[in-house]
Amino acid sequence: MKAVVQRVTRASVTVGGEQISAIGRGICVLLGISMEDSQKELEHMVRKILNLRVFEDESGKHWSKSVMDKEYEVLCVSQFTLQCVLKGNKPDFHLAMPTEQAESFYNSFLEQLRKSYRPELIRDGKFGAYMQVHIQNDGPVTIELESPAPGAASSDPKQLSKLEKQQQRKEKTRAKGPSESSKERNAPRKEDRSASSGAEGDVSSEREP
């Protein structure tokens, strides 16, 4: 699970030209849910978000207070594109949790936020909708969170096994293209006796490298 947390002076969500949600001072959270996420990651992320110290205290000391300490608002927006993996220059989202499962998981995430904080201060967008998210970033302050934290899974055999399988899938994907090209290059060519001496060179020059 990934989250981008932004400290804001205000933020809002508009769908179809109509504003459906808005907050004043607080944090805006863009949340990307992975197909590997469980209740454990959910609870960990909720704790991190609500206790993240991105505000100053009464004396002006920076990084001293959380959104709960200040009793500010939280706007949460589901954003599966945070689970993007690039294939060349094209985004691929196969690591994101499937839509129906993700919606239920996201609702559980919101429920946990409201249980852990004041429910009237938690706002959200509209899951699965095309939204315009208006964010007035304060600072700017933007923090990236990940659950589990990068490297934290190395001591967990189950997580390690998942990572190994993901890596194997990536390696197979990368190896598939070159192996086919290699077979093509190594295949014996039939000699065209009617062609000119430059014909073979012309054919090979049309191949993609």
Curated annotation (Swiss-Prot):
Record's catalysed reaction(s): glycyl-tRNA(Ala) + H2O = tRNA(Ala) + glycine + H(+); a D-aminoacyl-tRNA + H2O = a tRNA + a D-alpha-amino acid + H(+)
Disordered: annotated segments: 142-209
Post-translational modification note: Preferentially phosphorylated in cells arrested early in S phase. Phosphorylation in the C-terminus weakens the interaction with CDC45.
Presence of keyword Metal-binding: yes
Biased composition regions of type Basic and acidic residues, renumbered to the chain: 159-170, 181-194
Cleaved signal peptide residues: none
Location of this chain's protein in the cell: Nucleus; Cytoplasm
GO terms classed as biological process: DNA replication
GO molecular function, one term: D-aminoacyl-tRNA deacylase activity
Task of the protein: An aminoacyl-tRNA editing enzyme that deacylates mischarged D-aminoacyl-tRNAs. Also deacylates mischarged glycyl-tRNA(Ala), protecting cells against glycine mischarging by AlaRS. Acts via tRNA-based rather than protein-based catalysis; rejects L-amino acids rather than detecting D-amino acids in the active site. By recycling D-aminoacyl-tRNA to D-amino acids and free tRNA molecules, this enzyme counteracts the toxicity associated with the formation of D-aminoacyl-tRNA entities in vivo and helps enforce protein L-homochirality. ATPase involved in DNA replication, may facilitate loading of CDC45 onto pre-replication complexes.
Protein name: D-aminoacyl-tRNA deacylase 1
Naturally occurring in which organism (per UniProt): Mus musculus
Gene: Dtd1
